[in-house]
Amino acid sequence: MAAKDVKFGNDARVKMLRGVNVLADAVKVTLGPKGRNVVLDKSFGAPAITKDGVTVAREIELEDKFENMGAQMVKEVASKANDAAGDGTTTATVLAQSIVTEGLKAVAAGMNPMDLKRGVDKAVIAAVEELKCLSVPCSDFKAIAQVGTISANSDETVGKLIAEAMEKVGKEGVITVEEGTGLQDELDVVEGMQFDRGYLSPYFINKPDTGSIELDNPFILLADKKISNNREMLPPLESVAKAGNLLIIAEDVEGEALATLVVNTMRGIVKVAAVKAPGFGDRRKAMLQDIATLTGSTVISEEIGLELEKTTIEDLGHAKRVVINKDTTTIIDGIGNESAIKGRVVQIRQQIEEATSDYDREKLQERVAKLAGGVAVIKVGAATEVEMKEKKARVEDALHATRAAVEEGVVAGGGVALIRVAGKISSLTGENEDQNVGIKVAIRAMESPLRQIVINAGEEASVIANNVKAGKGNYGYNAYSEQYGDMIKMGILDPTKVTRSALQYAASVAGLMITTECMITDLPKSDSSDLSNAGNGGMGGGMGGMGGMM
């Protein structure tokens, strides 16, 4: 086992604070509408340019191991805030730095670290309750667009695109961000349920100009098995031959069964198309059941004793329209029962709560979106690849922020909400004087985001902070236009969830750092190669002497 380097008390805390400051100082320059960019060197390709706090934090590793421990603990604050709300990482870092700095000053002055932490925790619990009281719902197009604009670094186009996407696919719909091919940002909305499976034969195509298949009011047959012989295929075909079009979604359709479908289509006897079921294994079974719920059909599966030969028209589902191309199938306006669809969505949401892997959670959320609304894709446009990556990261942040705003509402932005909360809990007291100091540490930290926004805008932080504190309600300072006024009326909003998460995670990690008394790390390894080289050199000299003797 490697030897360890151990530091105690003030020596440990000073080193830790130095690491905290290096990381926080790099991150906090990005805060606010006039925050600056940070350029990150990459081992290959062009440097990355970002204004995203967590991206900057993740890049930082310090040479001194004790300092690095401090930096890594604050990095955890940014990562946790990002995971919980998708934004507010810089705010969380600024709050953590302030709590750690003021807290360690109090520890150095002889305060009890555990009571300080209890005081900080007490203040944060009270602050979170006050934040909930200040929060207002965010549901209309304008408010959603404003939240998106603020989070995307005052880019109004991005804010409007996100609001438009939410309006079209609903708040539960999936909105993804992709790199576009042009200079302009675009919004592409897929209504209905779409999955990544195309037609099994190009002979089904009935729209040669677009290379796609369009079926109006088709019946839909779902089969959890491979279909390969005519005997299985004929009953459903005969059922719909006179009634209309047919879409078959099965594990696979091959051999003579596929040939029969192609011949019937080409002769115009029945308009039919076949696609493979989406997903694999258990996920395929679940997605077939989703489609069944959406279209009012029954999945023909031998596991539940249903056979294709005995399929009747009652087992088939129905949709207003189906569009199939070589890569995707889109089912529009299925006739499934509304309450059954809602029940299915509730069931999948429960699975999301219980899911342990991010991949499973993401796939389940996609299924909810396909059942509940649709899918929107925001295609980000830019002139260069470097700009594209930076802009895409900003749009993703803005999307997370708007989702958080819809979930828990919004508060006045620009650090004003935390200033108002600090004012409301200023009379809070602890069980002893040390806890009171902890409460004051937390209250002072709540001013730090506003102060940093003002510093980044090149103004005097103390003057503006005092002016904002003297005001009431949503009165604050717009660093972008350099004006005072009602922040909500000026469209400067922060999602309540983002502000809450930033405060809670900052206090949690900072509280642990305040109560640190000892730090342990591996001793740096001595350069043993120099020693071995020296030894070899000595032997060489000896051998030379022996040669002389001979």
UniProtKB/Swiss-Prot annotation:
Gene (UniProt): groEL
Family, per entry: Belongs to the chaperonin (HSP60) family.
Coiled coil: none
Subcellular location: Cytoplasm
Molecular functions (GO terms): ATP binding; ATP-dependent protein folding chaperone; isomerase activity; unfolded protein binding
Primary subcellular site in the record, as a coarse category: cytoplasm
A GO BP annotation: protein refolding
Name of the protein in question: Chaperonin GroEL
One Gene Ontology cellular component: cytoplasm
Function: Together with its co-chaperonin GroES, plays an essential role in assisting protein folding. The GroEL-GroES system forms a nano-cage that allows encapsulation of the non-native substrate proteins and provides a physical environment optimized to promote and accelerate protein folding.
